Amino acid sequence: MVIEFDPIAPTSWADPYPTYRALRDTAPVHRSPSSGFYSVSRYEDVLSVLKRPEAFSSRAMFTVLMNGGKEELPALSWDFVRFLVRFPLRTRLNPFAFPKARNLIADDPPGHGTLRNVVNRGFTPRRIAAWEPRIRELVEQHLGALRRGEPFDLVHDFAIPLPVTVIAEMLGIEPERQRDFKRWSDAVIEGATGAGRARPFAPVYVDAVLELMAYLRRAIARRRRAPGDDLISAILADAPGGTRLSPTEAVLFVQLLLVAGNETTTNLIGNAVQALLDHPEQLARVRREPALVPALVEEALRFDAPVQTVFRTATRDVEL
Protein backbone atom coordinates (compact mmCIF):
# COMPACT_ATOMS: atom_id res chain seq x y z
CA MET A 1 0.00 0.00 0.00
CA VAL A 2 1.42 3.37 -1.07
CA ILE A 3 0.51 6.26 1.22
CA GLU A 4 0.63 9.77 -0.22
CA PHE A 5 1.36 12.15 2.64
CA ASP A 6 3.43 15.33 2.82
CA PRO A 7 3.40 17.04 6.26
CA ILE A 8 4.01 20.48 4.75
CA ALA A 9 1.40 20.29 1.97
CA PRO A 10 -1.81 22.24 2.79
CA THR A 11 -3.85 19.53 1.05
CA SER A 12 -2.80 17.04 3.74
CA TRP A 13 -4.98 18.61 6.42
CA ALA A 14 -8.52 18.47 5.05
CA ASP A 15 -9.14 15.09 6.72
CA PRO A 16 -5.82 13.66 7.95
CA TYR A 17 -7.07 11.06 10.44
CA PRO A 18 -7.62 8.13 8.03
CA THR A 19 -4.11 8.80 6.72
CA TYR A 20 -2.73 8.88 10.26
CA ARG A 21 -4.30 5.48 10.89
CA ALA A 22 -2.79 4.06 7.72
CA LEU A 23 0.61 5.50 8.63
CA ARG A 24 0.52 3.97 12.10
CA ASP A 25 -0.57 0.60 10.75
CA THR A 26 1.67 0.24 7.71
CA ALA A 27 4.32 3.00 7.57
CA PRO A 28 5.11 4.32 11.07
CA VAL A 29 8.18 6.11 9.67
CA HIS A 30 7.11 7.47 6.29
CA ARG A 31 9.17 9.50 3.84
CA SER A 32 7.41 11.98 1.57
CA PRO A 33 8.90 11.80 -1.94
CA SER A 34 7.78 15.36 -2.70
CA SER A 35 9.37 17.18 0.27
CA GLY A 36 11.76 14.59 1.71
CA PHE A 37 10.28 14.92 5.20
CA TYR A 38 9.91 11.83 7.35
CA SER A 39 6.66 11.50 9.32
CA VAL A 40 6.70 9.62 12.63
CA SER A 41 3.16 8.64 13.61
CA ARG A 42 3.17 6.17 16.51
CA TYR A 43 2.91 7.59 20.02
CA GLU A 44 5.95 5.79 21.43
CA ASP A 45 8.12 6.83 18.49
CA VAL A 46 6.96 10.45 18.65
CA LEU A 47 7.75 10.52 22.36
CA SER A 48 11.19 9.07 21.67
CA VAL A 49 11.91 11.80 19.13
CA LEU A 50 10.73 14.63 21.38
CA LYS A 51 12.72 13.39 24.37
CA ARG A 52 16.04 13.27 22.49
CA PRO A 53 16.93 16.83 21.45
CA GLU A 54 20.56 15.82 21.04
CA ALA A 55 19.49 13.56 18.16
CA PHE A 56 16.42 15.48 16.94
CA SER A 57 17.01 19.21 17.02
CA SER A 58 14.57 22.13 16.83
CA ARG A 59 17.18 24.67 15.76
CA ALA A 60 16.86 24.38 11.99
CA MET A 61 13.06 24.29 12.01
CA PHE A 62 12.25 27.60 10.31
CA THR A 63 14.98 27.31 7.68
CA VAL A 64 13.90 23.78 6.83
CA LEU A 65 10.20 24.64 6.65
CA MET A 66 10.74 27.61 4.37
CA ASN A 67 13.26 25.89 2.14
CA GLY A 68 11.59 22.65 1.12
CA GLY A 69 13.24 20.37 3.67
CA LYS A 70 16.81 21.68 3.23
CA GLU A 71 18.87 23.12 6.09
CA GLU A 72 20.89 25.58 4.02
CA LEU A 73 19.72 29.14 3.45
CA PRO A 74 17.32 29.69 0.54
CA ALA A 75 18.83 30.04 -2.91
CA LEU A 76 19.10 33.58 -4.20
CA SER A 77 16.00 34.77 -6.02
CA TRP A 78 14.51 38.16 -6.74
CA ASP A 79 12.09 37.62 -3.86
CA PHE A 80 14.92 36.81 -1.45
CA VAL A 81 17.08 39.72 -2.64
CA ARG A 82 14.11 42.07 -2.29
CA PHE A 83 13.57 40.74 1.24
CA LEU A 84 17.22 41.33 2.20
CA VAL A 85 17.10 44.90 0.86
CA ARG A 86 13.76 45.85 2.39
CA PHE A 87 14.29 44.15 5.74
CA PRO A 88 16.69 46.68 7.34
CA LEU A 89 14.94 49.61 5.68
CA ARG A 90 11.51 48.66 7.05
CA THR A 91 12.42 47.16 10.42
CA ARG A 92 15.78 48.75 11.31
CA LEU A 93 16.90 45.27 12.33
CA ASN A 94 19.82 43.25 10.98
CA PRO A 95 18.53 40.38 8.79
CA PHE A 96 21.75 38.44 9.32
CA ALA A 97 21.16 38.43 13.09
CA PHE A 98 18.12 36.18 12.72
CA PRO A 99 19.93 32.87 12.05
CA LYS A 100 21.80 33.30 15.37
CA ALA A 101 18.91 34.74 17.37
CA ARG A 102 17.47 32.55 20.11
CA ASN A 103 13.89 31.46 19.52
CA LEU A 104 11.70 29.59 21.99
CA ILE A 105 10.36 27.04 19.51
CA ALA A 106 13.60 26.72 17.54
CA ASP A 107 16.12 26.03 20.28
CA ASP A 108 17.32 22.99 22.21
CA PRO A 109 18.30 22.51 25.88
CA PRO A 110 19.78 24.16 27.80
CA GLY A 111 18.97 27.31 25.81
CA HIS A 112 15.33 26.35 25.48
CA GLY A 113 14.92 26.24 29.26
CA THR A 114 16.45 29.69 29.59
CA LEU A 115 13.99 31.09 27.05
CA ARG A 116 11.06 29.36 28.77
CA ASN A 117 12.00 31.22 31.93
CA VAL A 118 11.76 34.49 29.99
CA VAL A 119 8.23 33.66 28.83
CA ASN A 120 7.24 32.47 32.30
CA ARG A 121 7.77 36.00 33.60
CA GLY A 122 4.63 36.99 31.75
CA PHE A 123 2.51 33.96 32.71
CA THR A 124 2.77 33.78 36.48
CA PRO A 125 -0.33 32.53 38.37
CA ARG A 126 -0.87 36.07 39.63
CA ARG A 127 -0.89 37.55 36.14
CA ILE A 128 -3.17 34.84 34.77
CA ALA A 129 -5.64 35.36 37.62
CA ALA A 130 -5.56 39.11 37.01
CA TRP A 131 -6.38 38.65 33.30
CA GLU A 132 -9.28 36.25 33.81
CA PRO A 133 -12.03 38.84 34.57
CA ARG A 134 -11.11 40.89 31.49
CA ILE A 135 -10.99 37.82 29.25
CA ARG A 136 -14.42 36.75 30.51
CA GLU A 137 -15.67 40.26 29.78
CA LEU A 138 -14.33 40.10 26.23
CA VAL A 139 -15.97 36.71 25.68
CA GLU A 140 -19.31 38.13 26.84
CA GLN A 141 -18.90 41.15 24.56
CA HIS A 142 -18.24 39.00 21.50
CA LEU A 143 -21.11 36.64 22.34
CA GLY A 144 -23.38 39.63 22.94
CA ALA A 145 -22.65 40.93 19.46
CA LEU A 146 -24.25 37.80 17.98
CA ARG A 147 -27.97 38.18 17.37
CA ARG A 148 -29.98 35.62 19.28
CA GLY A 149 -32.04 33.36 17.05
CA GLU A 150 -30.22 34.35 13.86
CA PRO A 151 -27.58 32.28 12.05
CA PHE A 152 -23.96 33.38 12.35
CA ASP A 153 -20.53 32.21 11.27
CA LEU A 154 -18.83 30.87 14.39
CA VAL A 155 -15.31 31.23 13.03
CA HIS A 156 -15.68 34.62 11.33
CA ASP A 157 -17.91 36.24 13.98
CA PHE A 158 -16.41 34.79 17.16
CA ALA A 159 -13.44 32.42 16.92
CA ILE A 160 -11.31 34.83 14.86
CA PRO A 161 -11.94 38.20 16.55
CA LEU A 162 -11.90 36.96 20.17
CA PRO A 163 -8.31 35.62 20.32
CA VAL A 164 -7.00 38.64 18.41
CA THR A 165 -8.62 40.99 20.92
CA VAL A 166 -7.39 39.01 23.93
CA ILE A 167 -3.76 38.66 22.84
CA ALA A 168 -3.62 42.29 21.66
CA GLU A 169 -4.83 43.53 25.06
CA MET A 170 -2.40 41.23 26.87
CA LEU A 171 0.44 42.64 24.77
CA GLY A 172 -0.75 46.20 25.39
CA ILE A 173 -1.51 46.92 21.74
CA GLU A 174 -3.79 49.78 20.74
CA PRO A 175 -7.34 48.63 19.82
CA GLU A 176 -7.14 50.30 16.41
CA ARG A 177 -4.24 47.98 15.42
CA GLN A 178 -6.09 44.73 16.16
CA ARG A 179 -7.21 44.22 12.55
CA ASP A 180 -3.59 44.63 11.51
CA PHE A 181 -2.56 41.98 14.05
CA LYS A 182 -4.86 39.41 12.48
CA ARG A 183 -3.57 40.21 9.00
CA TRP A 184 0.04 40.04 10.16
CA SER A 185 -0.49 36.76 11.99
CA ASP A 186 -2.11 35.18 8.93
CA ALA A 187 0.82 36.27 6.76
CA VAL A 188 3.36 34.71 9.13
CA ILE A 189 1.53 31.37 9.19
CA GLU A 190 0.63 31.24 5.50
CA GLY A 191 4.10 32.21 4.35
CA ALA A 192 5.82 29.60 6.53
CA THR A 193 3.47 26.63 6.43
CA GLY A 194 0.57 27.24 4.04
CA ALA A 195 0.14 28.11 0.40
CA GLY A 196 3.09 30.48 0.63
CA ARG A 197 5.56 27.68 1.30
CA ALA A 198 6.27 27.36 -2.42
CA ARG A 199 7.28 31.04 -2.49
CA PRO A 200 7.80 32.13 1.15
CA PHE A 201 9.55 35.39 0.28
CA ALA A 202 6.78 36.59 -2.03
CA PRO A 203 5.89 40.27 -1.41
CA VAL A 204 2.36 39.41 -0.28
CA TYR A 205 3.85 37.64 2.77
CA VAL A 206 7.10 39.52 3.27
CA ASP A 207 5.58 43.00 3.25
CA ALA A 208 3.06 42.08 5.95
CA VAL A 209 5.72 40.41 8.11
CA LEU A 210 8.08 43.38 7.77
CA GLU A 211 5.24 45.70 8.71
CA LEU A 212 4.63 43.57 11.81
CA MET A 213 8.31 43.53 12.77
CA ALA A 214 8.63 47.29 12.33
CA TYR A 215 5.62 47.83 14.56
CA LEU A 216 6.92 45.42 17.21
CA ARG A 217 10.39 46.99 17.21
CA ARG A 218 8.85 50.38 17.99
CA ALA A 219 6.51 48.92 20.62
CA ILE A 220 9.38 47.07 22.30
CA ALA A 221 11.55 50.20 22.31
CA ARG A 222 8.73 52.11 24.04
CA ARG A 223 8.39 49.38 26.70
CA ARG A 224 12.13 49.44 27.37
CA ARG A 225 11.94 53.18 27.98
CA ALA A 226 8.70 53.09 29.97
CA PRO A 227 7.61 49.59 31.11
CA GLY A 228 3.92 48.99 31.71
CA ASP A 229 1.84 46.14 33.12
CA ASP A 230 1.49 44.33 29.81
CA LEU A 231 2.97 41.08 28.55
CA ILE A 232 5.69 42.74 26.45
CA SER A 233 6.98 44.64 29.47
CA ALA A 234 7.00 41.47 31.58
CA ILE A 235 9.06 39.59 28.99
CA LEU A 236 11.54 42.44 28.64
CA ALA A 237 11.99 42.83 32.40
CA ASP A 238 15.48 42.05 33.66
CA ALA A 239 15.36 39.19 36.15
CA PRO A 240 18.21 38.69 38.66
CA GLY A 241 20.75 36.56 36.83
CA GLY A 242 18.27 36.27 33.98
CA THR A 243 18.42 36.70 30.24
CA ARG A 244 18.19 40.00 28.40
CA LEU A 245 16.78 39.63 24.91
CA SER A 246 18.43 41.35 21.97
CA PRO A 247 16.20 43.58 19.81
CA THR A 248 15.89 40.80 17.23
CA GLU A 249 15.09 38.17 19.87
CA ALA A 250 12.49 40.41 21.50
CA VAL A 251 10.71 40.90 18.16
CA LEU A 252 10.74 37.12 17.56
CA PHE A 253 9.35 36.47 21.03
CA VAL A 254 6.43 38.86 20.70
CA GLN A 255 5.73 37.68 17.15
CA LEU A 256 5.57 34.10 18.44
CA LEU A 257 3.12 35.09 21.18
CA LEU A 258 0.93 36.86 18.64
CA VAL A 259 0.75 33.86 16.33
CA ALA A 260 0.52 31.25 19.11
CA GLY A 261 -2.24 33.16 20.88
CA ASN A 262 -4.22 33.81 17.73
CA GLU A 263 -4.41 31.06 15.11
CA THR A 264 -4.27 28.14 17.54
CA THR A 265 -7.13 29.45 19.68
CA THR A 266 -9.29 30.11 16.64
CA ASN A 267 -8.73 26.54 15.47
CA LEU A 268 -9.40 25.13 18.93
CA ILE A 269 -12.76 26.89 19.21
CA GLY A 270 -13.85 25.78 15.75
CA ASN A 271 -12.67 22.20 16.19
CA ALA A 272 -14.26 21.86 19.64
CA VAL A 273 -17.67 23.13 18.51
CA GLN A 274 -17.57 20.93 15.40
CA ALA A 275 -16.76 17.89 17.54
CA LEU A 276 -19.69 18.64 19.86
CA LEU A 277 -22.05 19.04 16.91
CA ASP A 278 -20.81 15.72 15.52
CA HIS A 279 -21.40 14.06 18.91
CA PRO A 280 -24.71 15.51 20.19
CA GLU A 281 -24.75 13.18 23.20
CA GLN A 282 -21.53 14.81 24.44
CA LEU A 283 -22.96 18.27 23.78
CA ALA A 284 -26.05 17.40 25.84
CA ARG A 285 -23.84 16.10 28.65
CA VAL A 286 -21.77 19.29 28.80
CA ARG A 287 -24.94 21.38 28.84
CA ARG A 288 -26.20 19.33 31.80
CA GLU A 289 -22.85 19.47 33.59
CA PRO A 290 -21.01 22.76 32.93
CA ALA A 291 -18.28 21.66 35.35
CA LEU A 292 -17.06 19.39 32.54
CA VAL A 293 -15.98 22.34 30.39
CA PRO A 294 -12.31 22.34 31.54
CA ALA A 295 -12.06 18.63 30.69
CA LEU A 296 -13.81 19.34 27.38
CA VAL A 297 -11.12 21.86 26.45
CA GLU A 298 -8.33 19.41 27.26
CA GLU A 299 -10.04 16.65 25.28
CA ALA A 300 -10.63 18.98 22.32
CA LEU A 301 -6.90 19.73 22.26
CA ARG A 302 -6.22 16.00 22.04
CA PHE A 303 -9.12 14.89 19.85
CA ASP A 304 -8.68 17.38 16.99
CA ALA A 305 -5.57 19.38 17.79
CA PRO A 306 -5.20 22.94 16.43
CA VAL A 307 -1.53 22.15 15.74
CA GLN A 308 -1.06 18.82 13.98
CA THR A 309 2.73 18.58 13.64
CA VAL A 310 6.01 19.40 15.32
CA PHE A 311 9.22 19.44 13.31
CA ARG A 312 12.70 18.23 14.21
CA THR A 313 15.94 17.79 12.27
CA ALA A 314 17.95 14.60 12.79
CA THR A 315 21.49 15.49 13.83
CA ARG A 316 22.81 12.00 13.08
CA ASP A 317 21.69 8.66 11.68
CA VAL A 318 19.06 7.23 14.03
CA GLU A 319 17.04 4.03 14.09
CA LEU A 320 13.54 4.10 15.59
Model-identified regions with their sequence ranges:
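Cytochrome P450
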Residues: 1-320
